[in-house]
């Protein structure tokens, strides 16, 4: 809902615009007024242009009708959001590897943007097989350990229990803690993966930050 983010904004610290919505001018304007980083997913075909153009648009000031912090309809004037980034979610093929990341960095620099990207471990990067998410995450962590400075985060699809289920079945037959949208890894796998990433990156991120200061 592009009308309510200013009213709900204090509840969130990060936002993402999906692959099919990144082209929307309404959502680009909305992103320009959010007081948080916003990620734009690459196109469903894997193209980067839409996400990069969305970042550039969201960094500019805009005016549009919305709802303010008091819940009142008003004309909002934004200053632009400098904290946009690309989310690599795959497309016709995965795009989380070192060559794909380097290509994204190159295109962002060409557009006058600071390379900043997030790796979506699900969707096209896992070929829609939720059990492959840890492998994608491990690749991204390896790139960071090898010196990559543009990868700023990872996206996982996680739930209490693994897999997914239809929301159209009788409620009495639905399983507790199982996604009704995309298939997810379970909490045990998620916790193990998070602990492993923390261990692998100890000292790495702090060193990267000290180099950027």
Curated annotation (Swiss-Prot):
EC identifiers of the protein: 2.5.1.54
UniProt-listed GO biological process terms: amino acid biosynthetic process; aromatic amino acid family biosynthetic process; chorismate biosynthetic process
Membrane-spanning residues: none
Catalyzed chemical reaction(s): D-erythrose 4-phosphate + phosphoenolpyruvate + H2O = 7-phospho-2-dehydro-3-deoxy-D-arabino-heptonate + phosphate
Pathway field: Metabolic intermediate biosynthesis; chorismate biosynthesis; chorismate from D-erythrose 4-phosphate and phosphoenolpyruvate: step 1/7
GO CC terms: cytoplasm
Cross-referenced InterPro entries: Aldolase_TIM (IPR013785), DAHP1/KDSA (IPR006218), DAHP_synth_1 (IPR006219)
Keyword flag Transferase: yes
Annotated Gene3D superfamilies: Aldolase class I
The keyword Chloroplast appears for this protein: no
Enzyme class: transferase
Molecular function (Gene Ontology), one example: 3-deoxy-7-phosphoheptulonate synthase activity
Key words of the record: Amino-acid biosynthesis, Aromatic amino acid biosynthesis, Transferase
Domain of life: Bacteria
SUPFAM superfamilies: Aldolase
Family: Belongs to the class-I DAHP synthase family.
General function of this protein: Stereospecific condensation of phosphoenolpyruvate (PEP) and D-erythrose-4-phosphate (E4P) giving rise to 3-deoxy-D-arabino-heptulosonate-7-phosphate (DAHP).
Note: There are 3 DAHP synthases, AroF is feedback-inhibited by Tyr. The other 2 DAHP synthases are Phe- and Trp-sensitive, respectively.
Protein name: Phospho-2-dehydro-3-deoxyheptonate aldolase, Tyr-sensitive
Species whose genome carries this gene: Enterobacter agglomerans (Erwinia herbicola)
